[in-house]
């Protein structure tokens, strides 16, 4: 049975053009990028060209881009790195209640080190409360960390406004942009972003590679000791094929963003239209207007979310009930609870995240099966 993939917020299929770009560095140009001989110099050149591509697309300097193993490492490095570097200035961090576990768990670890963390509320759409954010700022606040777009409900946060608040109060601003990069054109200068996390596999690039943008002049502590790679900020031999792949993937994403987003949004809206018309007792979660183009999070009354997923899987349909990083948890989504969804209804959610390879025929197949599954579950 062919799989029909609707979980692009969890990961995306590697683009064939990206794979083609990576192949020479897996087969012929396999030299260590830190080596001085020609094979190593070829690898170094490829790494720096990819760094330049990413920097140009984010409107920053190549020296402000640091390669990591992915979004979680980038988030950990950003938050712990700033906290430990500026502890003498203060010990207070502000974040939101709907962040990815890579941010929330990092903040919880810092609380064990006597850092203080304020968790800002969001409204029913998942949008951060800017007035509460302002009211939580203290003389000891050193960092604000708010995600660019939510991985479960797709809500896009008012990043420019948050960046302005942070700048006016001389506080560093980090955004987990893992879901946004590749879907939204981001200018770190215009948005007053000091630190930004991204991950290659969210925009049709390879897994196991990410990056951290850190504005010049912002200091952060390193957490992997050893060699002097990444300007002595992250030890370890560079993953050259993955770095090359991520640079190519982001370049492709930017060049075709409007076209793909328009198509993906059209499919998402068609899916929701059919669901609203053909299945009763549903609730669409998140900001209907201001969200990622492929995201749809719907709760189905009297139909267990895990049961829906298992039944969809039996029909070859891949979907999710929320963050892939919390799968296996019996607890309802912290994001849905934060936006006021009742606990039972939060357990009955289905996240569909569409991508550039999805088709209208696949959406029809999804809804046709979903109708039958919900009907069966409600009759039990």
Locate predicted features:
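Pyridoxal 5′-phosphate
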Residues: 1-380
């Amino acid at each position: 049975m062919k799989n029909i993939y609707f979980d692009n917020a969890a990961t995306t299929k590697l683009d064939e053009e990206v794979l083609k770009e990576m192949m020479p560095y897996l087969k012929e140009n396999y030299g260590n990028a830190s080596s001085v001989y020609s094979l190593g110099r070829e690898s170094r050149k490829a790494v720096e060209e990819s760094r330049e591509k990413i920097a140009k697309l984010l409107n920053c300097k190549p020296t402000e881009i640091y390669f990591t193993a992915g979004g979680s490492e980038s988030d950990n490095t950003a938050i712990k790195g700033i906290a430990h570097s500026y502890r003498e200035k203060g010990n207070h961090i502000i974040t939101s209640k709907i962040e990815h576990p890579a941010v929330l768990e990092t903040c919880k670890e810092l609380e064990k080190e006597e850092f203080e963390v304020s968790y800002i509320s969001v409204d029913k759409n998942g949008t951060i409360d800017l007035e509460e954010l302002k009211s939580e700022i203290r003389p000891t606040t050193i960092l604000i960390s708010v995600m660019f777009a939510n991985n479960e409900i797709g809500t896009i946060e008012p990043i420019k406004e948050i960046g302005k608040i942070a700048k006016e109060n001389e506080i560093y601003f980090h955004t987990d942009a893992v879901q946004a990069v590749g879907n939204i054109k981001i200018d770190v200068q215009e948005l007053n972003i000091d630190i930004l996390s991204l991950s290659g596999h969210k925009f049709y690039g390879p897994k196991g590679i990410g990056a951290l943008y850190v504005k010049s002049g912002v200091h952060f502590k390193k957490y992997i000791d050893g060699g002097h790679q990444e300007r002595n900020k992250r030890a370890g031999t560079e993953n050259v094929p993955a770095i090359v792949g991520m640079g190519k993937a982001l370049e492709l994403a930017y060049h075709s963003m409007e076209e793909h987003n328009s198509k993906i949004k059209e499919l998402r809206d068609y899916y929701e239209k059919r669901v609203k018309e053909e299945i009763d007792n549903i609730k669409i979660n998140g900001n209907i207007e201001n969200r990622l183009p492929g995201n749809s999070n719907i709760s189905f009354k009297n139909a267990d979310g895990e049961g829906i997923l298992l039944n969809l899987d039996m029909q070859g349909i891949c979907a999710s009930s929320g963050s892939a990083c919390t799968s296996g948890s019996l607890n309802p989504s912290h994001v849905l609870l934060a936006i006021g969804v009742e606990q039972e209804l939060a357990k009955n959610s289905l996240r569909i995240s569409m991508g550039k390879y999805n088709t209208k025929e696949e959406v029809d197949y999804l809804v046709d099966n979903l109708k039958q599954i919900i009907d069966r579950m409600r009759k039990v």
